[in-house]
Amino acid sequence: MEIKQLVLNKAKEAKESSRFIAKASTDLKNKIIVRMADYLKQNKDELIKANRIDVENAQKKGISKALIDRLTLTEKRIDEMIKGLQEVVALPDPVGEITKMWLRPNGMQVGKMRVPIGVIGVIYEARPNVTVDVTGLCLKAGNSVVLRGGSEAINSNIALVKILKEALKDEGMHEGVVTYIDISQREAVLEMIKLEGIIDLIIPRGGEGLIRTVTENSRIPVLKHYKGVCHVFVDRDADLAMAEEICFNAKVQRPATCNAMETMLVDENIAKKFLPNMLKKFEDAGVELKGCLKTKKIYPKVKDVKEEDFYQEYLDLVLNVKVVKNIDEAIEHITKYGSAHSDSIVTKDYNKAMKFLKEVDSSAVFVNASTRLNDGYQFGLGAEIGISTDKIHARGPMGLEELTCTKFIVFGNGQIRQ
């Protein structure tokens, strides 16, 4: 069977199953997710065995250590997936929630109710944990899901989906609620994103290349972030000890994440006082430093920064450093080079803090806090499917609520249009 038909069949299976999960009770959805967690626990050895095949294949192909690390499943990582499902069970179910209700002059009551989106297509790369994470979230929000993982993780994902489907079946739910496109060719992605009317929303999770391909070719609405080019601006009125701690955390704690700082901006009035200790601390942590001319005068060890570097999402221990005249120049820099993801100011000046919050147009803007905190759990929203830099439907961490939409509901007692 050709790829086009195979992808269509999988998507139709998800579409047909979506009405059953959409009307499922919270209790049933939670039971399914609990069973998924139990089955993962019972099948750890099988999962690690399947994953080992993917890891060995990746090593033979010379794939980078960073990618192999993301690909690898360990007992600890499976436990984290199980914990993630358990946390989804504990979250309130948004489906059926009436968010507004108002009375019209004719006595008619009009309201808005949260309902599932329907069928969500998730396209991702070499991270098998995404298979479980997004399934739990989509299912709890009453959606069926069409998964297409990276070819590097195909054996791991097939093993995971088999377990997830068994849990659905054993709780009496249609197995088509979770479908996996086990076709490694890129054509499968291009066919999947054409299926308007069957798949309702596409969420790509991966590198900039994948997200750009999906966005430029999809006939279905796409919820995404291209990349995280995040900034911390250290204002002249900053608490410098606090600034040092925030900047170090934003870069070093987990540099491969989308909310890690890529450029540090420093007000020229405090640059000579702040930069020597800060940059030495980064250097000791193994951070490669690239700086502007003013930075080099203060700390000659830094490499020259090029303009194209300011657009880069390094996802590594590499940092751009720029000395700016004031808050206005900092905001101009962020506006030009940033990706509208996560940006922070460190300052004791309330007016500057409010100016930064108002003028920096990102999914999350921070005052005196690390960009690494742009996260569903950190915000108290629970598990997330990703962080959106879009402005339509969802922006910032996308949790259960963002995997629903609303419909109008109307209560009348005989009203007609005059």
Curated annotation (Swiss-Prot):
<protein>
    <recommendedName>
        <fullName>Gamma-glutamyl phosphate reductase</fullName>
        <ecNumber>1.2.1.41</ecNumber>
    </recommendedName>
</protein>
<comment type="function">
    <text>Catalyzes the NADPH-dependent reduction of L-glutamate 5-phosphate into L-glutamate 5-semialdehyde and phosphate. The product spontaneously undergoes cyclization to form 1-pyrroline-5-carboxylate.</text>
</comment>
<dbReference type="InterPro" id="IPR020593">
    <property type="entry name" value="G-glutamylP_reductase_CS"/>
</dbReference>
<dbReference type="GO" id="GO:0050661">
    <property type="term" value="F:NADP binding"/>
</dbReference>
<comment type="similarity">
    <text>Belongs to the gamma-glutamyl phosphate reductase family.</text>
</comment>
<keyword id="KW-0641">Proline biosynthesis</keyword>
<dbReference type="InterPro" id="IPR012134">
    <property type="entry name" value="Glu-5-SA_DH"/>
</dbReference>
<dbReference type="InterPro" id="IPR000965">
    <property type="entry name" value="GPR_dom"/>
</dbReference>
<keyword id="KW-0560">Oxidoreductase</keyword>
<dbReference type="InterPro" id="IPR016162">
    <property type="entry name" value="Ald_DH_N"/>
</dbReference>
<keyword id="KW-0521">NADP</keyword>
<dbReference type="InterPro" id="IPR016161">
    <property type="entry name" value="Ald_DH/histidinol_DH"/>
</dbReference>
<dbReference type="InterPro" id="IPR016163">
    <property type="entry name" value="Ald_DH_C"/>
</dbReference>
<keyword id="KW-0028">Amino-acid biosynthesis</keyword>
<dbReference type="GO" id="GO:0005737">
    <property type="term" value="C:cytoplasm"/>
</dbReference>
<keyword id="KW-0963">Cytoplasm</keyword>
<dbReference type="InterPro" id="IPR015590">
    <property type="entry name" value="Aldehyde_DH_dom"/>
</dbReference>
<dbReference type="GO" id="GO:0055129">
    <property type="term" value="P:L-proline biosynthetic process"/>
</dbReference>
<dbReference type="Pfam" id="PF00171">
    <property type="entry name" value="Aldedh"/>
</dbReference>
<comment type="pathway">
    <text>Amino-acid biosynthesis; L-proline biosynthesis; L-glutamate 5-semialdehyde from L-glutamate: step 2/2.</text>
</comment>
<dbReference type="GO" id="GO:0004350">
    <property type="term" value="F:glutamate-5-semialdehyde dehydrogenase activity"/>
</dbReference>
